[in-house]
Amino acid sequence: MTNSTQTRAKPARISFLDKYIPLWIILAMAFGLFLGRSVSGLSGFLGAMEVGGISLPIALGLLVMMYPPLAKVRYDKTKQIATDKHLMGVSLILNWVVGPALMFALAWLFLPDQPELRTGLIIVGLARCIAMVLVWSDMSCGDREATAVLVAINSVFQVAMFGALGWFYLQVLPSWLGLPTTTAQFSFWSIVTSVLVFLGIPLLAGVFSRIIGEKIKGREWYEQKFLPAISPFALIGLLYTIVLLFSLQGDQIVSQPWAVVRLAIPLVIYFVGMFFISLIASKLSGMNYAKSASVSFTAAGNNFELAIAVSIGTFGATSAQAMAGTIGPLIEIPVLVGLVYAMLWLGPKLFPNDPTLPSSARSTSQIINS
């Protein structure tokens, strides 16, 4: 057996849950809308379950969703990834230069007459992904260690740069271009809290799970027994989160369909555009399939939890800015799932004979057609 064969990603045989992921997501979206429209008081009940501006039911779903991917990371390999200056440089430019600039351009192009929605959309573009990217990377057989490192770096930059970038894109750049400006004060602690809760807790759980599991039972047991047992919880947590998000926003989606459409168009262009810009940049810079998948999904996704929290804290829960933040994940989730399948399909074409391509057990044809 060649080394390239040995290093290929070899996920377990596709489970019943994984085989029909698009169907489960569509059903979860529909069920969430149904709950939001049919169960009176549900939105208020869920909205009341908050601590420090964080929705506990949604936080629970995100933590359950993120734990399995972080438990799969081989943390003894992350030091080597962190020293890859080429990978770090490409990711930082895509996340903190290209991403916010593209969202700024799309927001002004599609919402020139809607300053509140436009501001909310720009805030979404500033909130770089630190959560769901772990799921998208895992589904596309990306480099888990690289994704974990990129997410950690995004978290640090989130705390350090969010306020400054908000000031630049809402006040400085519009002023330079002769456009109307927006004044907004972002809470530093809301940003720190979002990072600590939505990344810190599952990251610590993943690290300690691997350390304790390998120490007591060994790596073979941990990776062949324990990880397959907890893997379904990532999808379960994702579906649970989708149901909650759509149930909370059911009224807005139905009562303001035109606003949703106007937000959806630039969001779809943004997610798809960032993904393919990042994929092309990764390919041209010589990265393999797995690292290209990690970089592409890290750059394409956004931290909707932070965008929602900042918009609500700054402009109010019923503001148009907050609506833009809450519509974000409703568009992002189905689009990013579609891009996972696009990555699996394009992988063999863009990266022929790449040793990090998913193995034949996880070939695109099996995933899509089985």
UniProtKB/Swiss-Prot annotation:
Activity regulation statement: Inhibited by carbonyl cyanide m-chlorophenylhydrazone (CCCP).
Record annotation: effect of changing E305 to A/D/F/K: Loss of transport activity
Subcellular location: Cell membrane
The entry's keywords: Arsenical resistance, Cell membrane, Membrane, Transmembrane, Transmembrane helix, Transport
Pfam families xrefs: SBF (PF01758)
Known outcome of mutating R210A: Decrease in transport activity
Biological process annotations from GO: response to arsenic-containing substance
Membrane topology: Multi-pass membrane protein
Gene Ontology CC entries for this record: plasma membrane
TM stretches of this protein: 16-36, 45-65, 92-112, 119-139, 148-168, 188-208, 226-246, 260-280, 304-324, 327-347
GO molecular function terms noted in the UniProt entry: antimonite transmembrane transporter activity; antiporter activity; arsenite transmembrane transporter activity
Topological domain ranges for the Cytoplasmic compartment: 1-15, 66-91, 140-147, 209-225, 281-303, 348-370
Extracellular face of the membrane: 37-44, 113-118, 169-187, 247-259, 325-326
Biological function: Catalyzes the proton motive force-dependent arsenite efflux from the cell. Probably functions as an arsenite/H(+) antiporter. Does not transport antimonite.
NCBIfam families for the chain: acr3
UniProt family annotation: Belongs to the arsenical resistance-3 (ACR3) (TC 2.A.59) family.
Protein name, entry field: Arsenical-resistance protein Acr3
